[in-house]
A protein has these predicted regions:
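Short, small-residue-biased leader/transition segments that mark boundaries at the very start
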Residues: 1-9
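Substrate-binding pocket helix/loop in short-chain dehydrogenase/reductase
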Residues: 15-18, 22-27, 124, 128
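Active-site helix of classical SDR
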Residues: 41, 75, 83
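Residue(s) in the substrate-gating loop at a strand-loop-helix junction
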Residues: 59
Length: 172
């Protein structure tokens, strides 16, 4: 990763079905995932050396229809499209832009962003796992490995892609 600068940005958003989602929920999700990302990258660009790498956090929900995830999924689809557009905008500076889309990852997020009880979160995790071809949720270190790859010289000819790290969840 010689000389590579990387900007990996956080994700946010709570889950709410269309029937009960509020304008505040929608605004918070888009303010963090779309507006916050856009202006953070804009302000960081003057600090980037030519030839750097920007890695955006999207989600497999950007290509899946998941009940309750509509606003979140739409915000992550916007993130995915930032990678496409910024790839073209930043090509003259040789800054590569990619997005990484995790699937179901074994973190506390399921319990903390959905309002589910611990027992309900475990049941949901088991249901997610049953829908993943690899039969399990991913590990945080697997996400880290994917981001490390995208930031490395080994991915020097990769830009504009959305790397799904999802155990096949959104692929089949």
């Amino acid at each position: 990763m010689t000389g590579v600068q990387t900007c990996a940005l956080p994700i946010s958003g709570t889950i709410a079905p269309l029937a009960v989602a509020t304008e505040a929920h929608f605004d918070q999700t888009f303010d963090v995932n779309v507006k916050g990302l856009f202006f953070t990258v804009q302000k960081a660009l003057p600090l980037f050396k030519d030839g750097g790498s920007i890695i955006l956090n999207s989600s497999v929900s950007n290509v899946m229809g998941l009940p309750g995830f509509t606003a979140y999924a739409a915000s992550k689809a916007a993130v995915r499209n930032f990678a496409r557009g910024w790839t073209m905008e930043l090509k003259d500076r040789k800054i590569r832009v990619n997005s990484m889309s995790p699937g179901a990852i074994d973190t506390p997020a399921l319990a903390t962003t959905t309002g589910l009880t611990a027992e309900q979160a475990e049941q949901a995790a088991a249901q997610f796992s049953s829908q993943i071809p690899m039969g399990r949720r991913g590990k945080p270190e697997e996400i880290a490995a994917a981001v490390t790859f995208l930031a490395s010289d080994e991915s020097s000819f990769i830009t504009g892609v959305d790397l799904a790290v999802d155990g096949g969840m959104a692929q089949v």
